């Protein structure tokens, strides 16, 4: 419903995987991927110079896709949605922070959004702004992997 509002900023968040410069990511719009055809839809697609689809890379299976839907691509092209990217490492750190500070076990996919939103809030420094994050899913299936990450990085 907010896409018609002029005083509302809408952000999408993509997985930067190991970093956009590494080429191992799923950040189709953030990396300025070209227009191509994927699954019959014309939209931005991660692909090589020959037009072959590149494999996307991210820890979050729900974000692991080489393209973006055409409606989202259009809204990004006219500036209605701004895209940000979060690395897998930043998402893992956000998962651990959310567990520690709130007791919430967010789905790993949600952690990309939480990280980018917190970063954007810090950048704006406007206490009168309201921020809405749409989250879904549960991180129960991510707990073992995140605990291993925590142990390996202590």
Located regions from the model:
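Solvent-exposed alpha-helices and their adjacent loops that cap or buttress functional pockets
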Residues: 2-5, 55, 74-77, 97-98, ...
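A short, acidic, amphipathic alpha-helical segment used as a generic capping/interface helix at domain edges
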Residues: 88-93, 113-124
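Catalytic phosphate/nucleotide-handling subdomain of diverse soluble enzymes
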Residues: 7-13, 24-25, 118-154
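Short glycine/serine/threonine-rich phosphate/pyrophosphate-binding segments
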Residues: 1, 20-22, 110-117, 141-143
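Sequence-level detector for tyrosine residue identity
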Residues: 2-3, 57, 74, 112, ...
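Active-site/ligand-binding loops adjacent to catalytic centers
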Residues: 12-104, 148-154
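Short glycine/threonine-rich catalytic loop with a Thr-x-Gly-x-Asp
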Residues: 105-109
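Anionic group-transfer/hydrolysis microenvironments
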Residues: 16, 111, 136
């Amino acid at each position: 419903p907010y896409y018609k509002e002029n005083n509302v900023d809408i952000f999408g968040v993509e997985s930067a995987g190991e970093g956009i410069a590494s080429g191992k990511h799923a950040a189709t719009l953030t990396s300025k991927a070209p227009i191509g055809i994927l699954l019959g839809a014309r939209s931005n697609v991660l692909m090589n110079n020959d037009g072959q689809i590149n494999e996307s890379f991210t820890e979050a299976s729900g974000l692991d896709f080489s393209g973006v839907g055409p409606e989202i691509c259009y809204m990004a092209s006219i500036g209605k949605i701004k895209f940000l990217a979060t690395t897998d490492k930043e998402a893992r750190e956000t998962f651990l922070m959310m567990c520690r500070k709130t007791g919430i076990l967010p789905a790993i996919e949600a952690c990309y959004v939480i990280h980018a939103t917190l970063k954007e809030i810090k950048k704006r420094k406007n206490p009168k702004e309201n921020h809405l994050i749409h989250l879904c899913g549960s991180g129960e299936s991510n707990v073992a992997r995140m605990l291993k990450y925590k142990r390996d990085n202590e």
